[in-house]
Swiss-Prot record:
Highest classification ranks of the organism: Bacteria, Bacillati, Cyanobacteriota, Cyanophyceae, Synechococcales
Subunit field text: Homodimer. Interacts with FtsZ.
Name of the protein described by the UniProt record: Cell division protein SepF
Subcellular location(s) per record: Cytoplasm
Region described as Disordered: 150-191
GO biological process: division septum assembly; FtsZ-dependent cytokinesis
Biased composition (Polar residues): 165-178
Function field: Cell division protein that is part of the divisome complex and is recruited early to the Z-ring. Probably stimulates Z-ring formation, perhaps through the cross-linking of FtsZ protofilaments. Its function overlaps with FtsA.
Top-level taxonomic group: Bacteria
Key words, A-Z: Cell cycle, Cell division, Cytoplasm, Septation
Family: Belongs to the SepF family.
Gene symbol of the encoding locus: sepF
GO CC annotations on file: cytoplasm
Biased composition (Low complexity): 150-164
InterPro entries cross-referenced by the UniProt entry: Cell_div_SepF (IPR023052), Cell_div_SepF/SepF-rel (IPR007561), SepF-like_sf (IPR038594)
Amino acid sequence: MSLISRLKAVVAGDEYLDDDFDELDYPSEDELNDINNFKQNPKNSNALANSNPFDFMNNNRSSKVVGMPGISNSSSEVSLMEPRSFDEMPQAIQALRERKTVILNLTMMDPDQAQRAVDFIAGGTYAIDGHQERVGESIFLFAPSCVNVTSSSPEEASPSSVSTENTPQYSLGKNTTPEPAWGNSKLSAYS
């Protein structure tokens, strides 16, 4: 068959040249027998109509429950990290995702890299609704949302934390927020 005759056949709508077949799904004999048996036995339809739709879910619920990884009621983990470069920061984010508290000691890093690291981890902590505190000079605590971070300082009468039940608490000596490297100057444009 030539190319022109094939084009004419396609444009004219000759279906025998189409390689696609209509595949109709006809019920098998077993399926037909099941349908006929169900129609003949009205007890099945009444039982289905009178049944509670929530019973099915309650019966199978215990088999579908899956525990969250990294959560344990007995203890909590704290990861102490002393990174030397920014390349080690994804490990801290992974620890936060595993619901571990991370203490970063950034004294070994270049100040610019340390600021970048704090910003990166602070963003990850914010994304998981966690908490962050500055513990000391270049030392920061980042905790997931399941951990209460309580700070006690003489200036504050009440702890600065979000309380939830059955979560471990870590106390810090002082509540100060991290300052960016460019915020070290005491000058203000509005003074």
